[in-house]
Amino acid sequence: MVLLLLVAIPLLVHSSRGPAHYEMLGRCRMVCDPHGPRGPGPDGAPASVPPFPPGAKGEVGRRGKAGLRGPPGPPGPRGPPGEPGRPGPPGPPGPGPGGVAPAAGYVPRIAFYAGLRRPHEGYEVLRFDDVVTNVGNAYEAASGKFTCPMPGVYFFAYHVLMRGGDGTSMWADLMKNGQVRASAIAQDADQNYDYASNSVILHLDVGDEVFIKLDGGKVHGGNTNKYSTFSGFIIYPD
């Protein structure tokens, strides 16, 4: 009986319909379906396999190389004109009709004197804005700075009135290009006002700046009374 079953099973499989094929594995046969578990579609074409679900998002790739440099853009619009520069120093007098320059040579005229209108405090440049004298136009009231127009030896002096009454002190420094060249201090000492004064003689080159900087405390302005003043003039040129 067993022998009959072993012979009948391969014959039944071989006679089944469809394009399926089988393969002998020893004494048994394995049936294979080329269309997968779903079989062919209605028109005989293989049925599509359902897509797999998307996997996890990958890491960000490395940054690519920089592209080529683009061409320069068009020029921008023309900017507004700048402010006019400071006037230059006066030139030496020319020879008059039939005359010559004095034997002593040219004597420059550079001098200024200005007072302080409004009070200041803290750490700032004192802008002496009440200008009385400015021969040569080397002092600028808006910035409080004297700019040397001619190399030579100059004299400067300053007198600053402290606004006290609260037990504090006041320091005022004369600066040349940001470096202290003279200092003065006024202390309260139970008084409402006290003066800090000093003077210097400096050699300056063209473009050097001289100004007074408050280094703590309060300064009385004085409106037009000129309690606090700054002055200077050239002694002789190089």
UniProtKB/Swiss-Prot annotation:
Gene Ontology CC, one term: extracellular space
Summary of the tissues where the protein is detected: Highest expression levels in testis and adipose tissue, lower levels in skeletal muscle and kidney.
Location of this chain's protein in the cell: Secreted
Signal peptide: 1-15
Limits of the Collagen-like domain: 53-96
Swiss-Prot/TrEMBL GO biological process terms: ERK1 and ERK2 cascade; fibroblast proliferation; negative regulation of ERK1 and ERK2 cascade; negative regulation of fat cell differentiation; negative regulation of fibroblast proliferation
Residue stretches making up the C1q domain: 105-238
Location of the region described as Disordered in the Swiss-Prot/TrEMBL record: 36-101
Top-rank taxon, per record: Eukaryota
PROSITE patterns named among the record's database cross-references: C1Q
Biased composition (Pro residues): 71-96
Keywords assigned by UniProt, alphabetized: Collagen, Secreted, Signal
Molecular-function GO terms, alphabetical: identical protein binding
Subunit-level organization: Forms homooligomers, predominantly dimers or trimers. Forms heterooligomers with C1QL1, C1QL2 and C1QL3, when proteins are coexpressed; this interaction does not occur after secretion. Interacts with ADGRB3.
Protein task: May regulate the number of excitatory synapses that are formed on hippocampus neurons. Has no effect on inhibitory synapses. May inhibit adipocyte differentiation at an early stage of the process.
Protein name: Complement C1q-like protein 4
Organism: Homo sapiens
